[in-house]
Design a protein with these regions (language model features):
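Secreted/periplasmic carbohydrate-active enzymes, especially glycoside hydrolases
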Residues: 1-9, 17-325, 329-335, 387-388, ...
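Substrate-binding/catalytic cleft of secreted carbohydrate-active enzymes
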Residues: 316-434
Length: 434
């Protein structure tokens, strides 16, 4: 109890201190290609499940702790804490220093925590508390998974793949073309040559291309390797809900002559576009038959439920907030579209724009709105199943925060529609009936 009270005081004094959130595709690393293809982390050396032990409660506050040992070899690595299924506001202290704070316990997030770690024993303390923006979560369904499911810590070499954009597009030449942008990170102080590798297989498991390419990256910076490959006249492999065929790729780094840090990737060929109030997949208008749906407690049950919905003619799912990453993997593989939604679900005062009315018109919350929209977008933007984005629920209201959220998302998403379900006839929405 005394430790929790001390930590609560620390939070109050140092709430502005935070570790850097990694706004990027959600991925983890594997030590071998075989483990990457089977999503098996049991042999991944630098991947540690986050298993927190409750150490005290005080009213609505609850504190959890975990100790990890950081080897000397991690001096050459960037360490991230992945938090998911938290369900409320939270703060994290590492070795007695405030590291990060979040009001959004719904959207999974990665945090760069290397600056707070030291060689040897480290104590990570997680404080769960009511969110200061709890009104944004009033209409959000709680995850069916157990709290802290899929939380983990992982280390990535300081010269590695920070992020990627991946697409397979049909050209005017009637061929498919791989467009792969690999964002390489060099966290050392001096220039490094980074060897970036990839392979690409057809949906029928035929190897089409593989290569290792070098990129010189200055110290403390990032650069992008653009891979453009002709995949041949294979329009029969275009992805849609009726033909969920996926190309398979593995990204990796080659270091000291050996491939390391494998990242599995599945890509649906083709493009989703929006015009004249309709969504098109590969130039064909989609007839949307949708249903609200959030993932079940695990992948097995979710697969069963999605197949049951498909058997009833449903081809589009509408979760009320960001889902676990395997949900989108399942939707890509099973052939079902997804309308992605940010974790913005207030239920009251949607029509009241006065002070104390809808939070969507409270300028003090614009940073929180943008954080939630960015967290939603970056982690899943490469999934073919996502055909549209919504900024929040029908009861979210409209105003300054929604205006800024719409403008930001439209600035980065050039093809898929961005919808404000609560725009009420205003300009900050693409016109589409869902």
């Amino acid at each position: 109890m005394r430790k929790l009270a001390i930590f609560t005081i620390l939070v109050a004094l140092c709430g502005s201190i935070s570790a850097q959130r990694a706004l990027r595709s959600e991925f983890t690393l594997y030590d071998t290609r075989e483990d990457a293809l089977t999503a098996n982390h049991s042999q991944t050396v630098n991947h540690i499940p986050f298993v927190a032990k409750s150490t005290g409660t005080l009213g609505a506050l609850e504190m959890f702790e975990m100790e990890i040992n950081v080897p000397a070899s991690w001096n050459d690595y960037n360490t991230y804490l992945h938090l998911e299924n938290i369900r409320t506001g939270y703060d994290v202290a590492i070795n007695g220093t405030m590291a990060l704070s979040s009001e959004d316990g719904t959207t999974p997030a990665d945090y760069f925590i290397s600056p707070q770690l030291k060689q040897g024993a480290n104590k990570i303390v997680l404080l769960l508390r009511p969110s200061s923006c709890a009104e944004l979560d009033e209409g959000t369904q709680k995850s069916k998974a157990e709290r802290f499911t899929n939380c983990y810590i992982f280390a990535q070499h300081r010269t590695g793949i920070y992020d990627f954009d991946a697409a397979i597009v049909a050209g005017d030449d009637k061929k498919l073309h791989l467009e792969l942008d690999l964002i390489a990170d060099n966290s050392f102080n001096f220039e490094e040559t980074i060897s970036l590798g990839y392979d690409i297989y057809t949906p029928e498991n035929k190897l089409v291309d593989y290569a290792v390419r070098e990129l010189i990256v200055p110290g403390r910076s990032r650069d992008t390797l653009k891979v453009r490959v002709d995949l041949g006249a294979e329009l029969r492999y275009l992805w849609s809900a009726t033909k969920p065929q996926l190309y398979r790729s593995t990204l990796y780094i080659k270091r000291n002559g050996k491939p390391v840090e494998y990242i599995p990737l599945y890509i649906g060929a083709g493009k989703t576009t929006f015009a004249d109030g309709k969504i098109y997949r590969n130039g064909t208008a989609i007839t949307i038959k949708s249903a609200p749906y959030n993932a079940a407690k695990d992948r097995i049950d979710t697969r069963k439920e999605i197949l049951a919905l498909k058997s009833k003619g449903i081809n589009t799912l509408k979760p009320d907030s960001p889902q676990p990453i395997w949900f989108y993997e399942l939707c890509d593989k099973l052939g079902v579209y997804v309308v992605e939604r940010a974790a913005i679900n207030p239920t009251q005062h949607s029509d009241n724009r006065a002070v104390g009315g809808t939070p969507s018109n409270n300028p003090q919350l614009v940073g929180e709105y943008l954080d939630r929209v960015k967290g939603m977008y970056y982690r899943t933007r490469n999934y073919s199943c996502i055909i549209a984005y919504t900024l929040g629920s029908e009861k979210a209201g409209n105003g300054y925060c929604m205006y800024k959220a719409y403008q930001w998302l439209k600035s980065v998403e050039k093809n898929r529609p961005v919808i404000c379900l609560s725009a009420d006839g205003e300009w900050n929405t693409d016109q589409l009936s869902l």
